[in-house]
């Protein structure tokens, strides 16, 4: 299982996303230049230049024609994937923490941090025809989080673009009805900040990772907790295999606490759990720091990890992975 190392970012990776076909990987990092790579051979296609701060989030739409990024420079950018040109720039009041396209690709959502006397806010915008006027256009929807709800740290679109699921700093998960503009449900299964949420390929459930050293599987409609995957250290990212009943977890300590730990200590492994039995069955070493983001290839035959060390690693599963059975 020889990995491809994608070296191009100078700073820590914050998020990685595959497009729908899985031929491209989009990565964002703290060095202000989101990049796009070929997933087959690890060649860098190019960068999207325009941000002047750490880019916290990246997402690509269903047709791989548009990209959305949000950064610490208090801007959300929309890009043309093919040419790398910026289609629109939306200024915000504080740094942009999450951004997502809806399934239809007609709308996008992004959320801002609670900072400088500005509350945490969630915006939904129409992205059907983007031009320079988008910077001053009103959002379709704006939700403001109060003190109890705490700031949004990750976000997903629910079924049929009717709902948005948010993960918060206090560990709560909330589902919002976008038509009635109200909160439908909230659960507090996690006890610490949510770090990442990723949907299963059919959209019926999602996995959330948290600093409380666990990842949990939730029903994406009722927010019922279905499974819990426990580890000894904070989980920064988790993803569900589209091929098998497997969940991959990545993490490590907080970046601040990593000083002189060797990779052999096993703190920065990708860990594989069985979705149903909640049992760990494999680990993959590699990064020289915590894993910040993970994603399965849409065909389930490989996966990518982005770490605090600035590398994106692509790992293709060998034959023993497909032959593995649980007793």
Swiss-Prot record:
It is found in: Cytoplasm. One of its GO terms (molecular function) is translation initiation factor activity. Signal peptide: none annotated. One of its GO terms (cellular component) is eukaryotic 43S preinitiation complex. Pfam families: EIF3I. Keywords: Cytoplasm, Initiation factor, Protein biosynthesis, Repeat, WD repeat. Disulfide bonds: none annotated. WD repeats lie at residues 8-47, 50-89, 147-186, 189-228, 286-327. Component of the eukaryotic translation initiation factor 3 (eIF-3) complex, which is involved in protein synthesis of a specialized repertoire of mRNAs and, together with other initiation factors, stimulates binding of mRNA and methionyl-tRNAi to the 40S ribosome. The eIF-3 complex specifically targets and initiates translation of a subset of mRNAs involved in cell proliferation. Belongs to the eIF-3 subunit I family. This is Eukaryotic translation initiation factor 3 subunit I.
